Each structure stands twice: as structure tokens, then as C-alpha cells.
Swiss-Prot record:
Catalyzes the NADPH-dependent reduction of N-acetyl-5-glutamyl phosphate to yield N-acetyl-L-glutamate 5-semialdehyde. This is N-acetyl-gamma-glutamyl-phosphate reductase. The active site is at C117. The lineage of its organism: Bacteria, Pseudomonadati, Pseudomonadota, Alphaproteobacteria, Hyphomicrobiales. GO terms for molecular function: N-acetyl-gamma-glutamyl-phosphate reductase activity; NAD binding. It comes from Rhizobium johnstonii (strain DSM 114642 / LMG 32736 / 3841). Its EC number is 1.2.1.38. Coiled coil: none annotated. SMART domains: Semialdhyde_dh. GO terms for cellular component: cytoplasm.
Length: 310
């Protein structure tokens, strides 16, 4: 019998993307409730408890409520895509390539917290350097990023695509998170192995899907002898054997005139780059991904597959 999967919040942006990725699969059975019944708590609870894996695509408070609905049922495993549990030590963090053991931890877990889109890029760049001893304690990390507007859900999609919307956004690019308290900072800090919270400056561009995350570094303030080449080598070693996360060769990066934010639109992979001038004292680390792919729905399906294979 095929394992039963219930997407709680299947009619939202992330939920719809997960359904699209699972369309046509015969190895799982998708449970579903009509959109008109999506707020029917009794029906949701029945579906949640009838699933082998429940994928929660809900706001934080609603996710916490859903977890309570299945807390006594050890037969139900949960993947949550909100920020509610990402730094909870009782939950496996769903970035399978984060370190060599993480995929196994996800596979064995009952509760998996799907990473945020921005943290996937930031942690993907930062954690290997912390693990390798290149990035010292106390280093003042800055993370700058731009996302496609689908990351803001249905409300922002309407604001960006409908010029008649009462709160229409006409700017081709805008900065937000201005008080520097974005909800993704805690998971960047914890899973990036940082002892000091980064300064995170997110922004949104007038494109639907895609993301660029940048982490600029001063080599003089890193471990003695660190070069652009040694940073690149550390990333290559960390992701050796991985298919979903790849490190672009330095020669290929050097030849690029630009990085296109929508290059990986519709894909569930992530590319990492190291930019700079050999012998200079600065580098810029860049992660490229689809905010709805490896940054959300693609990661959720990847985590589901790891859990089903265990």
C-alpha cells in the first residue's frame, strides 16, 4: 500500500508547488480536502491523523495547532514549512546537504522543519566555513539577498501582478526587513553555527521565482592564510558527492559577466559561487536557487522522499 501524504495548506503557494511536484507519482497516495473545507478543523484533524506524512504549509500558529492535532499519534510524521520549529532541538532541520549526517537525521526523524529560502542559501555558504575553521568566532557576517515575489505568498503575488490592487507594488525592486529582525535570522544563526547573529538585509524583485543570497567576506579577518581558493576548496569538499547543491568552478565563475536571479527557476537545485580577484583581500560568496524550489517546496519533497526511504 502506498504511503499516504496530506498537505495541510495545499491551496497556498508552497502547497500548490508541492502538489505539482508530486503529480503523477504512483508511489504515494495524496489525501486532500476541498478548498472550501480548508478551515474545517475536524476534517483537517482526520486527514492529518490518517496520513503517514503530513506536510504543513501554514502560518506559524496554524502549524503549531496542527502539530498538536497529531502529537498523540506516533504513526504520523510531520514536515513543517513554517518558521515555527526551525530552531527547535526536537525537530530535524530539513537541509539534507548541511552536513554529512543530516540526510540520515531527516530520514529517521518524526518531525522535520523545512528550511527557509534565504537561510538555505546563507547556511549553505556559511556553515562549511565554520566547520572548516575558516570563519572565526565573532566575525560580523552580513547577508544580502533578493527573492522572487512568490516568497510573499498569495498576498504579495496579487500586489505585484495586479495593478488595480489597493496596495499594488509598482517598484521593480524593494528592500524590507528594515529593523533587522527578520524571522529567518535565528535559523541562520543556529544552523550556520554562528555565535553572533548576522546582519540580514532581504529584498524582493519584480520576478516571480528565483533568489540570490550574498555573503561578502574580508579575507584578512578570517583564519590565517585564507584565500579565495581555500574558501572554494572548503565548499567543494563539504558538498562532494552531492547532486542538489553544487559549487561552481572558480574559472567558470570568473568568466561570468553577471548572475541571473531566475536561472534556476523551476528547479530544486542550488549553485554556490566564490567571486573575487586572486590575491585581493575580499571575496563575495553567492548562492543561487529558486525560492520555491530548494528554498521551499522542492526541499519539502526531498525531505519526504528521505523519510519514506527510511
Amino acid at each position: 500500500m502506498a504511503p499516504k501524504i496530506f498537505i495541510d495548506g495545499e491551496h497556498g503557494t508552497t502547497g500548490l508547488q508541492i502538489r505539482t511536484r508530486m503529480a503523477g507519482r504512483r508511489d504515494v497516495e495524496l489525501l486532500s480536502i476541498p478548498e472550501a473545507e480548508r478551515r474545517n478543523a475536524a476534517m483537517r484533524e482526520d486527514m492529518l491523523n490518517g496520513a503517514d506524512i503530513a506536510i504543513l504549509c501554514l502560518p506559524d500558529d496554524a502549524s503549531k495547532e496542527a502539530v498538536q492535532m497529531v502529537s498523540a499519534n506516533n504513526n504520523v510524521r510531520v514536515i513543517d514549512t513554517s518558521t515555527a520549529f526551525r530552531v527547535n532541538p526536537g525537530w530535524a532541520y530539513g537541509f539534507a546537504e548541511m552536513d554529512k549526517q543530516q540526510a540520515d537525521k531527516i530520514a529517521a526523524a518524526r518531525f522535520v522543519a523545512n528550511p527557509g529560502c534565504y537561510p538555505t542559501g546563507a547556511i549553505g555558504l556559511i556553515r562549511p566555513l565554520r566547520a572548516a575553521g575558516i570563519l572565526p568566532d565573532g566575525y560580523p557576517i552580513t547577508v544580502n539577498a533578493v527573492s522572487g515575489y512568490t516568497g510573499g505568498g498569495k498576498q504579495m503575488i496579487a500586489q505585484m501582478e495586479n495593478p488595480d490592487h489597493p496596495d499594488a507594488i509598482t517598484a521593480p525592486h524593494f528592500l524590507y526587513g528594515l529593523p533587522l529582525t527578520h524571522k529567518h535570522v535565528p535559523e541562520m544563526t543556529v544552523h550556520g553555527l554562528l555565535d553572533r547573529a548576522p546582519i540580514f538585509s532581504p529584498s524582493v524583485g519584480k520576478f516571480a521565482q528565483g533568489m540570490i543570497v550574498q555573503v561578502p567576506l574580508h579575507l584578512d579577518d578570517l583564519a590565517e592564510g585564507t584565500t579565495m581558493e581555500s574558501i572554494h576548496a572548503a565548499l567543494v569538499a563539504h558538498y562532494a558527492g552531492q547532486d542538489i547543491v553544487s559549487v561552481v568552478p572558480l574559472a567558470e565563475s570568473k568568466a561570468l559577466p553577471r548572475v541571473n536571479a531566475i536561472e534556476l527557476e523551476g528547479k530544486d537545485t542550488m549553485k554556490l559561487f566564490v567571486f573575487g580577484t586572486p590575491g585581493a583581500s575580499q571575496v563575495n560568496l553567492v548562492a543561487l536557487l529558486d525560492n520555491l524550489g530548494k528554498g521551499a517546496s522542492g526541499a519539502a519533497v526531498q525531505n519526504m522522499d528521505l523519510m519514506l526511504a527510511s
